[in-house]
From Swiss-Prot:
One of its GO terms (molecular function) is magnesium ion binding. It comes from Buchnera aphidicola subsp. Baizongia pistaciae (strain Bp). Thiamine diphosphate binds at E51. Dimer of large and small chains. Its EC number is 2.2.1.6. Mg(2+) binds at D448, N475. It holds the Pfam family TPP_enzyme_C. GO terms for biological process: isoleucine biosynthetic process; L-valine biosynthetic process. Belongs to the TPP enzyme family. Gene3D superfamilies: 3.40.50.970, TPP-binding domain. Residues 397-477 are annotated as: Thiamine pyrophosphate binding. FAD binds at residues 153, 261-282, 304-323. Pathway: Amino-acid biosynthesis; L-isoleucine biosynthesis; L-isoleucine from 2-oxobutanoate: step 1/4; Amino-acid biosynthesis; L-valine biosynthesis; L-valine from pyruvate: step 1/4. This is Acetolactate synthase large subunit.
Length: 576
């Protein structure tokens, strides 16, 4: 039996869990852990420049790989700096384990130096949290934490470690549990067969069905089963922001993204559907608009592993609790064994209507403009990378342009903060992706507002030689804020302009990277090709692109309207 100190147990537990990377920042309460990390081998630590970035890097790592991201921060400000990243992961169901230092057990509650109640602060935004009270409990708690983070609906876990239990002079028996079970937590993995049969009966008789998929399809690795079901039944598919790439964007049945800035055909199809098969979605406000007007004629079948997500905002007529991949396999097996193609309703008229909506060309824009259009930037970079890059974004117009105009044809290639909408996410997340997948092309598409939130991580990129391509869509403003002010507040621009932007090229160069500026549409493709060439040579390349500051993201749903009520262009509204 091994006798280890608490700090050694932390590192040994991570090694036994198979962890390869930790994203963190040292401080007094965790120096014993950092000393153990120095002396033990098997884990690489990535030193960030801010703890928020540590959580975003771990988040990007987790989204791109499906593995659990690990964060290590000190007590007090180190812990509180990680909160935004934890909330980001929680909203999007991303598995993280965040290890936070804490003051000594005897000092908790006495306002000691760098003390904060990390358990209390993080409680609403974690799947579970642990305050470790005994050194010998460390292996068992770590095993539980990693199982909880990845099982059922994934999410972040916090482990708070008081400094005294890490004491390198006190040795305790180290026992790594082979198995773990928590009696109060047992996710349902298989769908109820009766509910599945009922759902399938309704689905194959539908005249205007649609499959609506969310991030749960990505998390559960269900994209192959989804594609097979959609093709077997010839049903159109629409996606939330989080599900891009689960079904190839160029698939003929993919109506692309729905919701606030979704395509005309996606929003019209779901509004007019008579049956909605929703898989791994939350029905959040960005995808429903006014819930009282939501899809008035639809029977809703909702599949989700989290029973609390079902009927939370939109009531499901047929709820099915289970792991999406398992449930889809159950549906496919039932379809194969009990139904023939002659029983499936002919959807010719439905597809004719959908193709009519598609003819609106809701994503068309001015391609002859003398100013650079952000849509054109995304289309060109998508073509140059064959839609195969891993793409991170921040939040705002650039995020929506990327979602609408980049052709994501594989799952896990789109990495963004969907639920919380976190500015400053894109750069550190891209570094996490690149660390996990060093041979892949990684893009960070951002804006002049968002990039400044965590721009210090250009230093981290240089230290670890992480070569990514940053496309800064620079409109000298907070673009989405300005768009809302244009449309809703009669053009009253209150604090949405950036009047003192840095020289991004010189800033990137000061960190040791390559900077490229683009001002003219005719230079766009040529300079983006150059940027990709420099990227392939192992450089981080920062491309500052001056875009049309007046460009808006369309379509845009009308507030408090139905899914079918949209602004298609500046001069065109529709509720037809």
């Amino acid at each position: 039996m091994k006798m280890l100190s608490g700090s050694d147990m932390v590192i040994r537990s991570l090694i036994d869990q198979g962890i390869k990377y930790i994203f963190g920042y040292p401080g007094g309460a965790v120096l014993d852990i950092y000393d153990s990390l120095k002396q033990m081998h098997g884990i690489k630590h990535i030193l960030v420049r801010h703890e928020q970035s540590a959580t975003h890097m771990a988040d990007g790592y987790a989204r791109a790989t499906g593995k659990i991201g690990v964060v290590l921060v000190t007590s007090g400000p180190g812990a509180t700096n990680s909160i935004t990243g934890i909330a980001t992961a929680y909203m999007d169901s991303i598995p993280l384990v965040v290890i936070s230092g804490q003051v000594a057990s005897s000092l908790i509650g006495y306002d000691a130096f760098q003390e904060c109640d990390m358990i209390g602060i993080s409680r609403p935004i974690v799947k579970h949290s642990f305050l470790v009270k005994n050194t010998e409990d460390i292996p068992k708690i770590f095993k539980k934490a990693f199982w909880l983070a990845s099982s059922g609906r994934p999410g972040p876990i916090v482990i708070d470690l008081p400094k005294d239990i890490l004491n390198p002079l006190i040795k305790k028996p180290y026992i790594w549990p082979k198995l773990i079970s928590i009696r109060s937590y047992s996710p349902v993995l298989q769908g109820h067969q009766g509910q599945i049969k009922k759902a399938l009966h309704i689905l194959i008789k539908a005249k205007q069905p649609i499959i609506y998929i969310g991030g749960g399809i990505i998390t559960s690795n269900s994209h192959k089963e989804l594609k097979l079901l959609a093709e077997t039944l010839n049903i159109p598919v629409t996606t939330s922001l989080m599900a891009l790439g689960a079904l190839p964007q160029n698939h003929p049945q993919n109506l692309k993204m729905l919701g606030m800035h979704g395509t005309y055909e996606a929003n019209m199809a779901i509004h007019n559907a008579d049956v909605i098969l929703a898989i791994g979605v939350r029905f959040d406000d960005r995808t429903t608009n006014n819930v009282d007007k939501y899809c008035p004629n639809a029977t809703i079948i909702h599949i989700d592993i989290d029973p609390t997500s079902i009927s939370k905002t939109i009531s499901a007529h047929i709820p099915i609790v289970g792991h999406a991949r398992n449930v889809l396999k159950q549906i496919l097996n039932l379809l194969k064994n009990q139904f023939s193609k002659k029983n499936i309703y002919n959807l010719e008229h439905w597809w004719k209507q959908i193709n009519c909506w598609k003819s609106k060309n809701s994503l068309e824009y001015d391609r002859k403009s003398k100013k650079i259009k952000p849509q054109n930037v995304i289309e060109i970079i998508s073509a140059l990378t064959n839609g195969n890059a891993f793409v991170t974004s921040d939040v705002g117009q650039h995020q929506m342009f990327t979602a609408l105009y980049y052709s994501f044809n594989k799952p896990r290639r789109w990495v963004n903060s969907g639920g919380l909408g976190t500015m400053g996410y894109g750069l550190p997340a891209a570094l996490g992706v690149k660390l996990a997948l060093p041979k892949e092309t990684v893009l960070c598409i951002t804006g002049d507002g968002s990039i400044q939130m965590n721009i210090q991580e250009l230093s981290t990129a240089m230290q670890y030689k992480l070569s990514i391509l940053i496309l800064n869509l620079n409109n000298r403003s907070l673009g989405m804020v300005k768009q809302w002010q244009d449309i809703i507040y009669s053009g009253r621009h209150s604090h949405s302009y950036m009047k003192s932007l840095p020289n991004f090229i010189k800033l990137a160069e000061s960190y040791g990277h390559i900077g490229i500026s683009i001002h003219n549409p005719e230079d766009l493709e040529k300079k983006l090709k150059l940027a990709l060439l420099k990227l392939d040579q192992g450089n981080l390349v920062f491309v500052d692109i001056t875009i049309d500051p007046e460009e808006h993201v369309y379509p845009m749903q009308i507030r408090s309207g139905g899914m079918n009520e949209m602004i298609l262009r500046t001069t065109e509204h529709t509720s037809l």
